[in-house]
Amino acid sequence: TVRIEPLIEEIVERYERGLADLPFSLIKHYGDDFASSGHLMLARIEGASQEFRNAFINEMGEEGVACNVHYKPLPLLTAYKDLGFDIADFPNALAQFSNEVTLPLHTKLSDDDVDYVIAMCHDVFARLSAKGVR
């Protein structure tokens, strides 16, 4: 039987090392008194706008790397808007959402796959920055 946790932990550590030189704030998966299930690799691109985040996701997709945005703030959902919720009342939720990207994280990723994702993060970040997208 293959245990999933060590595989995910290896991938998370590989991402942490490989993305350390980018202005990405990665969610902490492991600490002295906690461990996550490792089902998402959430990264905040520090200082990035939604425009940059969206362009990053699109360009990563063009490079064959599926990225996403998770955890849309509830006030942005129609049901909550209809109840009178206003995203302006939740600035922290909006800030988290605005520059958050979810990178691939699953047990079928090989070391080469993770290295490719890391390399594309560097390349796409550099390309967008060179174009002046922020």
List where the protein language model places each region:
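PLP-dependent aminotransferase class I/II
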Residues: 1-134
